[in-house]
Each structure stands twice: as structure tokens, then as C-alpha cells.
A protein has these predicted regions:
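Pyridoxal 5′-phosphate
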Residues: 1-389
Length: 389
């Protein structure tokens, strides 16, 4: 099978798995049991990896919390800030095209009496397609806003948000700015020493690390704003009482290794992946009349280089997937693809429900090859033609 669903997950880099193995088999000490050498060894390894992670994000190591993944990180960031006992503000602002791990959290807050504003994004035919409407954002944020939460890059259409502008709008009213950076970390430059974001969420499995481990940064932006969190998990006091539970050295080491590789190899990988996306798109355009792109222009400043989202004339994406089973791709977010509803991201772009159902997403990754892309084009075009006669 040709795997073109790297926004859902990425394969674990063999070099990452190699670094994990000793900590799964040989060095199994509890990093919080430091009365003996095995525990101290595990703690030291975690501390080293936290330093690596923090350095690549432009923050201090003590500003990184280890979680089970970005879903937990988003919950901890949003709920933790809004439900802290000293939080007096009762307003949250987000975008209409966030991941469900953000939208569902703010919906729960709304049910509990918080005021939630969901800002639309520019439509598919706009020059800034997929980017949040900054004028509407500025009008919505007020002195009661506790948090603005907007993703760094979108998991379906790959749009990169104007982070500096969002940060400025959030901070001038005294709100904190959280970003679900799951699709950005390891793919593009995420430098919190340069971009004034207070908290970000990420998952290792999106940048060729293992599943089940992620992070939440709480540095408070360039200004070092105070971030008060009410913990979700209690019962051990680990990670400064903000996230209880025994940390897994193998997972933390793997995430540090994966991020190190992703950052150091980013320029080379981006060139290859961008070329393969162009190869795939050009092949599909030549083979399928009327195929149309969804989302922003294929420019690095606006869109993740490996992302391609397009819609078909005449058939639904699910049917195309079934007819092209040699290629792994998707019709939307893997975290919510069991939902019968069309993608809220695509309808948020202004597409009709029919257009959204006729859309698919490809995610090209560093382990793909041009030969795979050529074969994928053959399979995809043949699959489409088998459905349309």
C-alpha cells in the first residue's frame, strides 16, 4: 500500500524506535523514584530530552509538560485556564475550523456558562482562503476574554494561520493565546522565542515519533506571561502538580529524538515533499477533468508543503477511496472520520455539503518517493474512471 495520509499519523522513524528500545527493555526505572540509580538514570534521560525539545521550540525546559498527546494537551490548556479558581474572565475565542479536540472542549465550556465566540475563516475563493478573519477576531476579543485558541496549521487543508497577528490581537486585551500546533511542530518553524504564543499543543506521532506522547508548552509567550492551569489529572504531583502520572522515559526520549531529526532535516524534507505534492497534483489534473483544489494557494508561507486537499466532479470521496484501495488517503480528519457529517473545515471554507463530500485529503511525508507518487496517480485516476465510466 502507498501511504499518503501523513496528516493522520506518520510512521515512526527507525532511528527514533532505535533510541526507544533500551528504555523499554533495559533501563526501565521509574523517573520519579530517584532514591536509586535506575530512577535517577531515567530522570536524567527525561531531563536531557526535555532540554532538546525546549531548545527546538525556543523556550525553557521547565515550560514543557509531557502529555499523552495533543488531545490531552488541548483539554489541559483550554479547560485548565478557563476553570482555574483565580480565573475571572468568562469568554473564549476560537475559529470555526479547529480540530474537534478544541471545538468540543469549548462547547463543553459553553454549556457550563462560558461565552464562546467562533470566528469564521476566509472562503475558498479568497486570497487568504482558510485563514481566520482578523477583523472579526479583533472585534470579538474583549476585556472578558480569557483565552484565544487558534491552530497553527490545519489538519485538513494545511492552511498556516497568521500567528503574529493573532497573538497581537489576543494580548492587547490581556487574553492568553493557545495554539494547537499539532500539524506545525516538526513540519515548519515553531519558534516561541520569536512568535508570541503562550501555550502550544503537539503530538509526537505527527513528526515521525510514537503515538501516545505529546506536549503542552506553558512558557507564557515572549513576555513570560503567567499561565495558571487547573490540572485535569491529579494523584501523584508529577510535573509540578500540573499533570500527574508516571512519565515514560522511552516516549519522552523518542519525542525528543523525533523533533531533533524533524528540525535538523526540515529544509531537505520540505524540498522533497513539496516536489512530490506538485507531482501528485499535476498528475491528477492531467488524468481527471474538473478536479479542483480546496484551501489556500500551494505556497510555503500559506500551506503545509505535504498537504493536498481536492474535490472531484461527480463522485464522493469515500467512493474514490474504495475504488483506489492501493493508496491510503482520507476524506477528512482521522479523529472524526467515522462521523457521517461532511467536514466542518470544508463547509467552513464555504463549500456546500455536496462539495465537501466530494473532497479528499492527501498527506505526503518524508518516506514517500516519486515512484510511489507515480503509481498512486495511476491507481487514483483508474479508480476515478472506474466509477465514472
Amino acid at each position: 500500500m502507498i501511504y499518503l495520509d501523513n496528516h493522520a499519523t506518520t510512521p515512526c522513524d527507525p532511528r527514533v524506535a532505535e533510541q526507544m528500545m533500551p528504555w523499554l527493555v533495559e533501563h526501565f526505572g521509574n523517573p520519579h523514584s530517584t532514591s536509586h540509580e535506575m530512577g535517577r538514570q531515567a530522570k536524567s534521560a527525561i531531563d536531557t530530552s526535555l532540554g532538546v525539545i525546549a531548545s527546538h521550540l525556543g523556550i525553557a525546559p521547565d515550560s514543557v509538560l509531557i502529555t499523552s498527546g495533543a488531545t490531552e494537551s488541548n483539554n489541559l490548556a483550554i479547560d485548565g485556564i478557563c476553570r482555574h479558581p483565580r480565573q475571572r474572565r468568562r469568554h473564549v475565542v476560537t475559529s470555526t475550523i479547529e480540530h474537534p479536540a478544541v471545538l468540543d472542549v469549548v462547547a463543553r465550556l459553553e454549556k457550563d456558562g462560558f461565552r464562546v465566540t467562533r470566528i469564521p475563516v476566509h472562503s475558498n475563493d479568497h486570497e487568504l482562503a482558510g485563514q481566520i478573519d482578523l477583523d472579526q477576531l479583533a472585534a470579538a476579543v474583549d476585556d472578558d476574554t480569557a483565552l484565544v485558541s487558534v491552530h497553527w496549521a490545519n489538519n485538513e487543508i494545511g492552511v498556516i494561520q497568521p500567528m503574529e497577528s493573532i497573538a497581537e490581537i489576543a494580548h492587547r486585551s490581556g487574553a492568553l493565546f493557545h495554539s494547537d500546533a499539532t500539524q506545525a511542530v516538526g513540519r515548519i518553524d515553531v519558534d516561541l522565542g520569536r512568535v508570541d504564543v503562550d501555550l502550544i499543543s503537539a503530538s509526537a506521532h505527527k513528526f515521525y515519533g510514537p503515538k501516545g506522547v505529546g506536549l503542552l508548552t506553558i512558557a507564557g509567550g515572549i513576555a513570560g506571561r503567567r499561565v495558571r492551569l487547573k490540572p485535569i489529572l491529579v494523584g501523584g504531583g508529577q510535573q509540578r502538580n500540573l499533570r500527574s502520572g508516571t512519565m515514560a522515559p522511552a516516549n519522552v526520549i523518542a519525542m525528543g529524538t523525533a523533533l531533533e531529526l524533524a528540525v535538523t532535516e526540515s529544509a531537505q524534507v520540505a524540498e522533497r515533499v513539496s516536489a512530490m505534492r506538485s507531482q501528485l497534483w499535476n498528475g491528477l489534473v492531467q488524468g481527471i477533468d474538473g478536479i479542483f483544489p480546496n484551501g489556500p494557494l500551494h505556497e510555503r508561507s500559506r500551506r503545509l508543503v505535504g498537504n493536498l486537499n481536492c474535490r472531484l466532479p461527480g463522485i464522493e470521496g469515500e467512493s474514490w477511496m474504495a475504488a483506489s484501495s492501493e493508496v491510503a488517503f482520507s476524506s477528512g480528519s482521522a479523529c472524526s472520520s467515522v462521523d457521517a457529517k461532511p467536514s466542518h473545515v470544508l463547509t467552513g471554507l464555504g463549500l456546500s455539503e455536496s462539495e465537501a463530500r466530494r473532497s479528499v485529503r492527501f498527506g505526503i511525508g518524508k518516506f514517500n518517493t516519486p515512484d510511489q507518487i507515480d503509481r498512486a496517480i495511476e491507481v487514483l485516476v483508474a479508480g476515478y474512471r472506474s466509477l465514472t465510466g
